[in-house]
Amino acid sequence: MQYQNQDNFPERIEYLVDKLNGPSEFARKTGVTLSTITRWRKGEADPSRSNLVKIAEVTGVSIEWLATGKIKEEKTTEEKPAGSLVSRAFERMQAMLEEGVSMIDSYSSINVSAGFGSFNEGITQPDGQEPYSDELLTSLGVKADNCAVFWANGNSMLPTINNYDQMLVDLSRKEIQGDRIYLVQNGESVWVKRVKMEWDGISLISDNKEEYPPISITGENAQNLQIIGQVVHIGHSLI
């Protein structure tokens, strides 16, 4: 069965979610979080290579159709075995690498607060990957293996960082320097803020100062504060 108009990835995911009787069942069978599925359906993120393979296996579609929308949705007896399909997916990924694109682990399930703080429970593994130009990474002076991608939630860093902006974070840059922007964690809360060392602790400073005053962390709490990494690039939506 051909789906000639299924050339939009969010539409294909929407179709497969419906095919499995809704997001909850889709999440249960694929092992993907509901928040990640929501981002796929909205077109805010793309699945990793391993998730593409898992979705194809669970839903009975080919990886080619899932990735491109240009071939038959239903598998047939004339199709090559699954191993060949997986090989093709790896070949396409290799082609991207040869073209100067690196795939960087992303954490769409982590709620990074550009506000007053967020709660994230037990989230430590990446749930996707995002492509970044090697030329851009070189210009930023960072290495793909040291980076991860997160998304901002809130308006405290306006106008520098908008709500839902994609942030490239260098996880190797944990030393506080100047008024640079960092991802910081205190317990289960993760913020994106400017970080300033004070004589009695640390101040987390928002760019939207009128609505979000500095957060002072002192004493033992300051010692427990962890610098996840420095934000080195921000991706704004134009719509």
UniProtKB/Swiss-Prot annotation:
Domain HTH cro/C1-type: 13-66
CDD domains per UniProt: HTH_XRE, S24_LexA-like
Entry protein name: Uncharacterized HTH-type transcriptional regulator HI_1476
Lineage: Bacteria, Pseudomonadati, Pseudomonadota, Gammaproteobacteria, Pasteurellales
GO MF annotations, alphabetized: DNA binding
Keyword hit for Transcription: yes
Record bears the keyword Transcription regulation: yes
InterPro entries: Cro/C1-type_HTH, Lambda_DNA-bd_dom_sf, LexA-like, LexA/Signal_pep-like_sf, Peptidase_S24_S26A/B/C
Superkingdom classification of source: Bacteria
Segments of the chain annotated as binding DNA: 24-43
Pfam families for this protein: HTH_3, Peptidase_S24
Keywords carried by this UniProt record: DNA-binding, Transcription, Transcription regulation
